[in-house]
Amino acid sequence: MKVVLIVCLVWVMAMMELVSCECWSQADCSDGHCCAGSSFSKNCRPYGGDGEQCEPRNKYEVYSTGCPCEENLMCSVINRCQSA
């Protein structure tokens, strides 16, 4: 019984952590993060580092597969961050 209780407690804590990262807009995310994902499941994600997946910045700040790159990096045509 104790094991079931511990497993349930860990599961609830994990779900709370996932929910706390959800976002509706860029304003919901901290510095260095963007709001990205599908219409039904957006999460705050870190800006892309060198070689990581990215999406070019856009005026609407709407991203589906990844965030823009960190400063001094640009998003290449293959959606990977690289030196500008």
UniProtKB/Swiss-Prot annotation:
The lineage's top-level taxon is Eukaryota
Which keywords does this Swiss-Prot/TrEMBL entry list?
Disulfide bond, Secreted, Signal, Toxin
Q: What tissues has this protein been observed in?
A: Expressed by the venom gland.
| GO CC annotation, single | extracellular region
> Example GO molecular function term?
toxin activity
Which segment of the chain is annotated as a signal peptide?
1-21
Question: Where, per UniProt, does this protein localize?
Answer: Secreted
Write down the InterPro entries for this protein, in alphabetical order. Answer: Prokineticin_domain
What are the cysteine partners in each disulfide bond? Answer: C23-C35, C29-C44, C34-C67, C54-C75, C69-C81
Q: Which family does it belong to?
A: Belongs to the AVIT (prokineticin) family.
Q: What is this protein called?
A: U8-theraphotoxin-Hhn1c 1
Question: What organism is recorded for this protein?
Answer: Cyriopagopus hainanus (Chinese bird spider)
